[in-house]
Design a protein with these regions (language model features):
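Short beta-strand/loop motif that positions the catalytic acidic residue
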Residues: 105-107, 112-114, 118
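Alpha/beta-hydrolase fold nucleophile elbow
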Residues: 44-56
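Short beta-strand immediately N-terminal to the catalytic nucleophile in serine-hydrolase-like folds
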Residues: 51-54, 77, 113
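C-terminal catalytic histidine-bearing segment of alpha/beta-hydrolase fold enzymes
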Residues: 127-131, 135-173
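Active-site nucleophile loop of the alpha/beta-hydrolase fold
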Residues: 71, 75-85, 95
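Short alpha-helix in the alpha/beta-hydrolase fold that links the catalytic acid
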Residues: 108, 122-131
Length: 173
């Protein structure tokens, strides 16, 4: 992304990668809020220039944040409806990261990128989120794309789609 001119703020959620602690929905939401505050309050990045980008499990905290802040747009790559819907436990009452409920409340322009051969988070999740989304939205389907190869599979079309979306996202008033 940086090579294409996009500024990137990447971090590890608590309990993942180089971060200590235990992973949880609450911790992931706190972490993404901290990153937002750091960018806006300490670095002086205008909120309307920030694109929230969540990939796979990152779609949960990204949807959480997008409900609360005046960002430029939200991009979700290989997102899920909810965590338990991915692992076949959607009937439990304490499901986590219910993106399917959140996207209906998000006013930001939304781009969903999903591959038709994703065996981790089925393509149907991306379709369902697209249908449930309230604001301006676009679904970019990567034919034959899996969970971890969308950029590779789509090639230059991936970047063209992202560039076109970010060039003219419409805010819902």
């Amino acid at each position: 992304y940086a090579e294409r001119g996009y500024g990137v703020a990447a971090y590890d959620y608590e309990g993942y990668g180089q971060s200590g602690g235990e992973p949880s929905e609450a911790a992931a939401c706190r972490d993404i809020e901290r990153v937002w505050r750091y960018l806006v309050e300490e670095r002086g990045v205008p909120p309307e220039s920030i694109v929230i980008y969540g990939r796979s499990v990152g779609s949960g905290p990204s949807c959480f944040l997008a409900e609360k802040v005046p960002a430029r747009a939200l991009v979700l790559e290989a997102p899920f409806k909810s965590t338990f819907s991915v692992v076949g436990m959607g009937w439990l009452p304490f499901d986590r990261f219910r993106n399917i409920d959140r996207v209906a409340k998000i006013d930001l322009p939304l781009l969903i990128i999903h591959g038709t051969r994703d065996t981790v988070v089925p393509y149907s999740h991306g379709e369902a989120l697209f249908e449930a989304a309230a604001g301006p939205k676009r679904l970019y389907t990567v034919e034959g794309g899996g969970h971890n190869n969308l950029l590779f599979k789509a090639g230059e079309r991936y970047w063209e789609t992202l560039r076109e979306f970010l060039a003219s996202p419409e805010r819902k008033e």
